[in-house]
Swiss-Prot record:
Sorted UniProt keywords: Cell projection, Cilium, Cilium biogenesis/degradation, Cytoplasm, Cytoskeleton, Obesity
Stored PANTHER family: CENTROSOMAL PROTEIN OF 19 KDA, CENTROSOMAL PROTEIN OF 19K CEP19
Family label: Belongs to the CEP19 family.
Chain's role: Required for ciliation. Recruits the RABL2B GTPase to the ciliary base to initiate ciliation. After specifically capturing the activated GTP-bound RABL2B, the CEP19-RABL2B complex binds intraflagellar transport (IFT) complex B from the large pool pre-docked at the base of the cilium and thus triggers its entry into the cilia. Involved in the early steps in cilia formation by recruiting the ciliary vesicles (CVs) to the distal end of the mother centriole where they fuse to initiate cilium assembly. Involved in microtubule (MT) anchoring at centrosomes.
Phenotype when the gene is knocked out: Severe obesity, hyperphagia, decreased energy expenditure, impaired whole-body fat oxidation, altered hepatic insulin signaling, and impaired glucose and insulin tolerance. Spermatogenic cells and seminiferous tubules show marked degeneration.
Subunit structure and binding partners: Interacts with CEP43; this interaction is required for its localization to the mother centriole. Interacts (via residues 121-150) with RABL2B. Interacts (via C-terminus) with CEP350; this interaction is required for its localization to the mother centriole.
Top-level taxon in the UniProt lineage: Eukaryota
GO cellular component: centriole; centrosome; ciliary basal body; cytosol; nucleoplasm; spindle pole
The name this protein goes by in its record: Centrosomal protein of 19 kDa
Organism: Mus musculus (Mouse)
GO biological process: cilium assembly; microtubule anchoring at centrosome; vesicle targeting, trans-Golgi to periciliary membrane compartment
Predominant location: cytoplasm
């Protein structure tokens, strides 16, 4: 039986993931409540999302729901268990899913660095121009204004004696 996922959300009390789906054969919209058990404010959201998605009872319903979306729902649930407001949790998710250009990636541990690299890879794939794109131009020439004053950098102004 094939199910088409329409909406996916989270219920905080008692904790559950709620899926509104359409049965392909009948065409009726239905709601499935998947309780979240043994989840605390210290739980790993990625692991919990994978377990729910691979659960044999819910697997056929969650085929079309991306794992990232389930992870995000579990982050909302964990934030609620930690006592954070919805706005605070959304701000935390925004900080974790965006790259700060001023952040020193050398100071991050391996797990955080891998997360940042995966975010960069996703952004690269999303913004990459391919040959078959309608807006693709092979040889782009860019004119830079010559009348503006050039900004110097500290390594540009270093003396030659330092070398």
């Amino acid at each position: 039986m094939k199910y088409i996922a329409k909406k996916c959300g989270v219920r905080f009390q008692p904790p559950a993931v709620i899926l509104i789906y359409e049965n392909e054969t009948e065409g009726k919209s239905r709601q499935r409540i998947m309780p979240v058990r043994n989840f605390s404010k210290f739980s790993d959201c990625t692991r919990a999302a994978e377990q729910l998605k691979n659960n044999p009872r819910h697997k056929s319903y969650l085929e079309q729901v991306p794992l990232k979306q389930l992870e995000k729902l579990f982050v909302f649930l964990r934030g609620s268990l930690q006592g954070q407001s919805l706005a605070e949790t959304m701000e935390q998710i925004r900080r974790e899913t965006t790259i700060d250009p001023e952040e020193d990636l050398n100071k991050l541990d391996d797990k955080e660095l891998a997360k940042r690299k995966s975010i960069m890879d996703e952004l690269f794939e999303k913004n990459q121009k391919r040959k078959d794109d309608p807006t693709f131009v092979y040889d782009v020439e860019v004119e830079f204004p010559q009348d503006e004053q050039l900004l110097s950098c500290s390594w540009d102004t270093a003396s030659v004696d330092d070398f």
